[in-house]
A protein has these predicted regions:
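Extracellular/periplasmic carbohydrate-active domains that bind, remodel
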Residues: 1-219
């Protein structure tokens, strides 16, 4: 496990700002923690300042990420569980500030990808208009519990990786906060390439701050 660390990087002093997929340097050059083939691991009480990518968990089971803070210069990813089962990420906050040309928070918020299942994001504070990230290749059967401050419009993944999420994505007490005055999220539009294509997501206790948000094709 990893406990009680502050991780910093030279991304802070790199002359370019983050632009999504502008080049491999701004996307991936400074990556903090990458776990693969781990069982019963943990990260606790850790801060990340100025990173392209903070935590990625691949081909692992039963890990816990608890009490994590992200801050500093905006980068690509925050948390990602891919090809993994039973990952709990809780009590995390993204404090990366907004700028004139960019939303606050890392480009991708809480993320799931590549057949991951049975993962939980709990008590997560996102920035306004920051998107959760169901990144395709069929993640399914996940819970987002008490996630505050984000939206759904900028999930990652190409058309070849569709849908962004498979069945049984449950969003429990999700508090939506975006820059939209009004928007309808159609989660299964067969005629349009959308970055929020989820198979019948389930919303329980959804609330929205000053937005007129409606859904179509939810569970």
């Amino acid at each position: 496990g990893v406990e009680d660390f502050l991780f910093t990087s030279e991304w802070l002093n790199y002359p370019e700002e983050f632009v999504h997929h502008a080049n491999d340097v701004v996307d991936y050059a400074w990556r903090a923690l990458f776990f693969t083939n781990i069982k019963n691991g943990w990260v606790r009480n850790v801060k990340f300042s100025d990173w392209n990518d903070c935590i990625q968990i691949r081909k692992s089971v039963t890990m816990t990420i608890d009490s994590v803070e992200i801050s500093g210069k905006r980068g690509h990813g925050s948390f990602m569980a891919l090809s993994s089962t039973g990952i709990l990420i809780k009590n995390a906050v993204d404090l990366v500030p907004a700028k004139v040309y960019a939303n606050g928070g890392q480009r991708h918020g809480p993320a799931l990808q590549s057949g991951s299942t049975g993962c939980v994001y709990q008590n997560i504070k996102m920035q306004k208009n920051q998107s959760i990230d169901c990144h395709g290749d069929y993640p399914y059967g996940h819970l987002m519990d008490n996630v505050h401050g984000g939206t759904f419009h900028q999930n990652g993944g190409s058309k070849l990786a569709y849908p962004n999420s498979g069945p049984d994505l449950v969003l429990w007490n999700f508090k939506h906060d975006s820059n939209f005055d009004k928007i309808q999220f159609d989660f299964w539009d067969l005629n349009k390439h959308q970055l929020h294509t989820y198979l019948k997501p389930k919303f329980i206790g959804f609330t929205s701050l000053d937005d007129k948000i409606t859904f179509e094709n939810e569970g």
